[in-house]
């Protein structure tokens, strides 16, 4: 009985995850206490960061919330950080949590409009290079004024819509019914090749869109949370921020868009896959049927969604309230004026975002450990000890490396605080202070596309509903982001070092 009970516990632990994965998590949990007590808390802290990155990298084996959560519970018990420090980190990042709770749900209620608009774009543009460029540019443009997570949620919603329509039709189901589309077992063998090609096609568009959020987000005061933080510390307004950062952001934006076209033309790094003709036909038929069968109530609903989208853009651009609260406004407007009053239908809108919201809390616990154990402090002190002319370039590199494994806002906060203290104490001129602030801003935004945990939008994409459907793993995201990382990182470093 005891043997079977032990087997049951072992089987239940992390569910269907591979045995080697379960053994790895157990090994991590056994390794951390001796490291903490026998070596040093800092060594255990760095080990924890690496272990958490491992759980993110294996997201398709097991959702990172469970193994990452176990590691962070242990970190709290050991004293690597405190519940109060975690709470303070959550309060500091509460706008992001609000955004995930309400904005992503708000986008869910706009999915009919998004599917309508994106299907026109997808079916109307036959050149894959032009389509990739449009996705990248539109994401960059929107992210300069809206939040990157909001833009990513829009792209994910559209991709899930396309995938579900084709998968249901290919499986012999009604595309308008809520049938499962994650299981390929009902799919006839003749559709498998088309589905694999369609997955590769969607992967490339998703990655172009995700990189676009970073290209546009770096440009303006409202593009990323850390931009607002740095702008506040420097006393820069919208126009000031744009003009100060432009010598770096504009060349990088142009280079990023050129990279997008070249990747599609050369078909490198998993890009260049075309939309299969059979899939195009299915989507075109669906769009035509939708147009023919659309009732006056459905047209009215589309109109309401369009007006809500307009209100959303204006409200975000003018910053009338926190992003999450604007998302709640969108939910209220669309549901009230389209007749969605059933609690179950409302609940479906929150299903996708809540697991990621919980995972983000675990991520902020890692940030709290980094902060409390001062894991980044030696690197910061080393950069500020360099000659003044070397500091901008090295600050860009240091920011990029740390932002690739940690939270952008956290890294920017630490660096701008340290640099401002040095400025106040008379260690540098105002001009040099501004140059370093630009290096911090661009360093936290551009090279951090290297890994999914470097950008919140990338992490959201990795752990979203679309990632397992199109086989977008951590490793594949790193590989597909690599050319962008090299171009954006090298040009960004050169611009910071020689053009400011």
From Swiss-Prot:
Superkingdom in the source lineage: Bacteria
Disulfide bonds: none
Keywords of the record: Antiport, Cell inner membrane, Cell membrane, Ion transport, Membrane, Sodium, Sodium transport, Transmembrane, Transmembrane helix, Transport
Major location category of this protein: membrane
Reaction catalysis annotation: 2 Na(+)(in) + 3 H(+)(out) = 2 Na(+)(out) + 3 H(+)(in)
Subcellular localization: Cell inner membrane
Protein name (database record): Na(+)/H(+) antiporter NhaB
Organism of this sequence: Pseudomonas fluorescens (strain ATCC BAA-477 / NRRL B-23932 / Pf-5)
């Amino acid at each position: 009985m005891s043997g079977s009970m032990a087997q049951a516990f072992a089987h239940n632990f992390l569910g269907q995850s591979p045995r080697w994965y379960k053994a790895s998590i157990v090994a991590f949990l056994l390794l951390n206490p001796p490291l903490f007590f026998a070596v040093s808390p800092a060594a255990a802290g760095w080990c924890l960061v690496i272990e958490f990155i491992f759980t993110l990298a294996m997201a398709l084996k097991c959702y990172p919330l469970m193994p990452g959560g176990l590691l962070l519970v242990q970190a709290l018990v050991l004293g690597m950080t405190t519940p109060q420090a975690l709470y303070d980190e959550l309060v500091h990042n509460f706008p992001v949590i609000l955004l995930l709770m309400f904005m992503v749900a708000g986008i869910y209620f706009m999915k009919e409009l998004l599917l309508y608009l994106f299907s026109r774009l997808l079916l109307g543009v036959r050149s894959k290079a032009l389509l990739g460029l449009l996705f990248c540019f539109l994401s960059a443009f929107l992210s300069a004024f809206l939040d990157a997570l909001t833009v990513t949620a829009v792209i994910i919603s559209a991709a899930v819509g396309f995938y579900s329509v084709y998968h249901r039709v290919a499986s012999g189901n009604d595309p308008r019914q809520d049938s499962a589309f994650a299981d390929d077992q009902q799919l006839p063998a003749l559709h498998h090749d088309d589905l694999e090609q369609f997955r590769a096609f969607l992967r490339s568009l998703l990655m172009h869109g995700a990189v676009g959020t970073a290209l546009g987000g770096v440009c303006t005061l409202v593009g990323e949370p850390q931009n607002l933080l740095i702008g506040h510390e420097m006393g820069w307004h919208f126009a000031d921020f744009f003009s100060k950062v432009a010598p770096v952001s504009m060349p990088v934006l142009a280079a990023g868009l050129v990279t997008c076209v070249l990747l599609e033309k050369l078909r490198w790094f998993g890009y260049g896959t075309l939309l299969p003709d059979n899939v195009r036909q299915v989507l075109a038929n669906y769009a035509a049927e939708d147009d023919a069968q659309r009732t006056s109530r459905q047209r009215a609903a589309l109109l309401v969604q369009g007006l809500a989208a307009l209100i959303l853009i204006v409200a975000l651009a003018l910053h009338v309230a926190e992003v999450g609260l604007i998302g709640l406004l969108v939910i209220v407007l669309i549901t009230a004026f389209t007749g969605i009053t059933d609690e179950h239908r409302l609940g479906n809108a929150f299903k996708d975002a809540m697991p990621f919201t919980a995972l983000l809390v675990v991520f902020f616990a890692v940030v709290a450990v980094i902060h409390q154990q001062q894991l980044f402090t030696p690197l910061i002190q080393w950069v500020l000890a360099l000659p003044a002319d070397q500091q901008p370039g090295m600050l860009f590199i240091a920011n990029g490396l740390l932002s690739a494994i940690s939270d952008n806002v956290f890294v920017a906060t630490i660096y701008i605080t340290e640099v401002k203290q040095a400025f106040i104490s008379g260690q540098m001129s105002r001009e040099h202070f501004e140059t370093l602030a630009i290096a911090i801003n661009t360093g936290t935004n551009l090279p951090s596309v290297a890994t999914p945990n470097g950008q919140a939008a990338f992490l959201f994409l990795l752990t979203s509903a679309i990632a397992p459907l199109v086989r977008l793993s951590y490793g594949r995201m790193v590989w597909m982001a690599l050319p962008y990382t090299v171009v954006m990182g090298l040009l960004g470093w050169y611009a910071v070092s020689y053009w400011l």
